[in-house]
Amino acid sequence: KPSTRLTRSVASPIERDIETDLVGPPTRWFGGGDYQTDISTFTKGIEDSGIGKFQYILFDDCNMTGIEVAYELRNVTNHIIGSPTEIMAYGMPYKLLWGELSKVNPDYHRICNDFINFYSNYTYKGSSYPYGTISVIDCSQVENMVNLMKDINRSASLSPFVESNLQSMDGYNPSKFYDMGDYVRTILHNDPLLLARFNQQLNLLVPEKGNTSSYYTTFNKDSFGHVVPIRTYSGITISDPSSNPEVRQSLNKNLYYKATH
């Protein structure tokens, strides 16, 4: 996993916050601190295996459809399926999705629709928790977006942004992951031509996505969790605007950041 993200392990899925008094539903992560891997290691393992490029990689985990992840995986998979926010511990509703996931050429639009329909009606211990986000990233479009982001970051007409006004996609404080579309549209407020190029490329990079009106997070909140409204949603996150110390201190290891700055 890129250094801007908390390292996740590759062990079996368990409910997070199991030792706390969380009353609301837990969200999904994997294992603990003993066995971990980075996205770069995962990528190298795929490359060294000689099995070729995957049709898709599905992440049944939190905060995995970020531009940083897509950049590192761009050469080992055609698509990435996952959630830009936390996902409930129930995870992907495989019974509903398997009909498409098992195909050589899945219908990604249907996968997103079925996922959102499931989580729009999700309940936990008899209470309604209608929260979910999903997106599909086309990795063949990552290089084009990276080249465009180089131009954007070098632009002399970038508008200032207020971090707290951006669409946060997590419960960290300060946030680590922001909606990429919201961030770039904010800084390109005074450059309509460059913004038009970005919007066009974003639509190619994230061809399918879905979201409920809010997302749910268990981080740094009360025992019932916390619901965050989604006012804008591009289906992909970026950590560039984050002032979180963990993000800022790891930029020298962030391959996407180094490629675009």
Where are the regions that the model predicts?
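Terminal, contiguous helix-loop blocks that mediate binding/assembly
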Residues: 2-261
